[in-house]
């Protein structure tokens, strides 16, 4: 996370999300990295980016496993409430238009715009709903 945060910190318009980038691998239960932050020690943006990144990872094909369906990914997110994911952030994500995001992904979004734009889209969508 520190390399990405360093790059984004050089872009004035992106500085506000740098704390979220630095913390998006933290877990609510404190077993994340790089700092082992617990619960509210993790900035809201970090919780949102972490969930969006995890959803993208779960619903993407990997060399070692096929992509999960949206339903499987949502079930995994629910299973990890209070350990990996913040309950409020996850609730808003699940209640948001996840299926629209999924449809956009399936419609060539990933190839056309790249994964980072999908994570950004999901992050913005969840961030807007939480406010």
What are the functions of these language-model segments?
Residues 1-131:
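Histidine- and acidic-residue-rich, metal-dependent catalytic cores
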């Amino acid at each position: 996370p520190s390399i990405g945060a360093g790059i984004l910190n050089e872009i004035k318009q992106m500085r506000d999300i740098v704390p979220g980038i630095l913390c998006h691998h933290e877990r609510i239960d404190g077993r994340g990295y790089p700092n082992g932050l617990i619960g509210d020690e993790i900035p809201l943006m970090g919780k949102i980016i972490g969930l969006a990144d995890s959803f993208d990872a779960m619903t993407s094909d990997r060399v070692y496993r096929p992509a999960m369906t949206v339903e499987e990914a949502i079930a995994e997110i629910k299973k990890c409430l209070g350990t990996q994911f913040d309950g409020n952030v996850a609730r808003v994500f699940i209640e948001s238009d996840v299926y629209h995001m999924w449809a956009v992904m399936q419609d060539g979004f990933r190839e056309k715009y790249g994964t980072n734009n999908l994570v950004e889209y999901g992050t913005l969508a969840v961030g807007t709903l939480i406010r």
